[in-house]
Amino acid sequence: MIGINQLDLDRNLIMVMIDIENLHLISFNFIEELYAMNLDAVNPELESKINDLVCETYNKPFLEQEKLLKEAFELIPKPVTQWAHPTTMVTIALFELYYKNQKYEQAKEWLSIALSVADLGPTNAGTYLLAGIFYYDLENYDEAYKYFDIAYNDAGYYPFSIEDKKYWQFYKQRKDELNPKKKTKK
């Protein structure tokens, strides 16, 4: 790797890396987004404070968890959709809190925010898998399949491997129904 050449320093920053060994040219548009995806790269103290609030919720009653998680969410710089982390961490924690307590409308609101930042980070299969599980458990099978399919296309079977097998079985069966293998008769 010979290094990075900065071609433009405004918001439309383009950086080019040239890998001489493999003769690849890789360009990144909006390179600042690579850093903005993770608050820790920009403001590690704030990231740590948010992490501490989320950790503090462990084994607390519902109302205390809710208060701490919403406090953590308010600390995330606006717009929250620019940060893969900690937005995903906090919104998934709020989603799970409401979901476990059968407050499905609130759970859905927080899941929606988590999904809005899912593609900012390097790994997003877990967020999509949670969305699939949520909709499956609410018997909204079309939405469940949609999110399971995104998770599968992103990470294969692995995210399903740590969940109840019914989700994988549902996904596989629906996928086979929607994409039947063509059999030719001779």
Describe each PLM feature range.
Residues P77-G121:
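Alpha-helical adaptor scaffolds
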Residues C55-N59, L97, F134:
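Residue-level signature for tetratricopeptide repeat
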